[in-house]
Amino acid sequence: MSYEKAFEALKEGDFKAASALLEKAAEETGFESDLINHAYTLALYRAGEKDQLAQAAFRIGESLVDTDPGSAMDYFQRAFLGSPDGLNAAKMSRIAEIFALWTAPKDTSEQIAHPVRKVAHIVGSLAASHPTAAYVRMLALSLKQHGIESVVFTTEWSSSWFVNPAGESETQNLDPGCEVVIASVDGDFNERAQRIAASIRAYGRDVAFYHAGLREQITTRVATFRPAPIQVYAGRPGETAAAPFDVLAGALPASDIEERMQANPPSTRQGMGLESAASVSATFGNLQKVGGSGYLHALGEILQRFPKHFHLFAGSGDVKAIRAYLHAEGVLPRVRFLGAMSDVASVMGVVDIYLASFPHPGDTALLDAVGAGKPVVALRYPPGTPYNANAEMVGVPELLASREAEYSEIAMRLIRDREAREKAAAAVLARFQKEFHPSSLGPRYLRLVEEVRENH
């Protein structure tokens, strides 16, 4: 049977038509044609059919697990380009199960070094746009202060693949403060992972830190080969297979905001059109999660109470709902939308207090505010729940509210009372220096590694 019309539509850029025709072709061939499977998932991606892409790519990947692991990972990686609804928890669990089956048994006879002297960091790339690059640099420099040598091994998972067929590395000329080994992009995902694992073994590592989970298939596949005596997962919590790791630490919170504020020329209130502001608050992060929340009600109340108070928003997301609400409250003229910013360090100097949005936490931006010594007002939720992440990070009782009205009261007190604001800033900064300063990152991970060694 000929599928020329389907491929012609794809070639001509009619992705909607191509995806419909290629779906039929894939069904008719039982999802066994490499050419059609690739074209079908490409058409879905180009057409923006994210749910369907996640489902189709997962189905294809699962069918290849036993016969072609490299291609299976390729399609699982495509599935992650789909929406969270398409790749649901059940599918995530299934992928984790597959990686567990691929995981090599732990060599209990292998000697674990004490003290640790050499560690490997496995990361997708060291691109400037990749937040993990800054995190790896913080950890490597912290470990170096304790006499521990680091080497970064990139996987370059997004190069020479699917929508990015170019064979060039995405890693840029960034200095993580240690040696960097950039992965070759030759071969399939399985072959690429095997080479990286062999390089880590040859390096003579004591510990390997993996800075990504299942969303970077090659990175997790490297872990399944167990190239290090102790393996630490240091990526986003809940996004990996547990089997290959001795420590599921996740990315322990830390911020290099102090260094970034020194490196970025500071904005001024005059330069931002805030000359008339008596005080300024801010909220940074994914603004899509702000609209319609009780947080907006609290912000509107604060702005109404203090006619010379201004507020800054920075981040991605549709702000129509935010603007509409604040316009209805009559306070929109004193709100500035800065859009998506690669780094908020330059505007931290104009901020007096940081208002953490709720219920959705904004860990990275909030931690930057804490590190900049800004009093952060946050809402408490039951301990251990995801929504309580903001409160747990702030950790200063006087800044934590148990209800929306109290949230507003705390913010208003800080706006009104400079002395209270300075006292809160000192408390927040002291907590940051003790718990989240980059220099503390290495020792925090090493304590977890030591627990593994003692139980070996």
Predicted regions and their residues:
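Catalytic binding pocket for nucleotide-activated donors in carbohydrate/polymer assembly enzymes
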Residues: 353, 357-422, 426-432
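C-terminal alpha-helical cap of glycosyltransferases
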Residues: 438-456
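Active-site-proximal region of nucleotide-activated glycan assembly enzymes
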Residues: 77, 81-90, 226-266
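Short acidic alpha-helix that forms the nucleotide-activated donor recognition element
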Residues: 195-198, 203, 340-352, 371
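Short N-terminal targeting/anchoring amphipathic segment
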Residues: 200-215
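Conserved catalytic-core segment of nucleotide-activated headgroup transferases in glycan assembly
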Residues: 132-142, 256-328, 334-337
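N-terminal subdomain of nucleotide-sugar transferases
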Residues: 76-172, 176-178
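Active-site donor-binding acidic/aromatic loop of nucleotide-activated sugar
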Residues: 332-341, 358
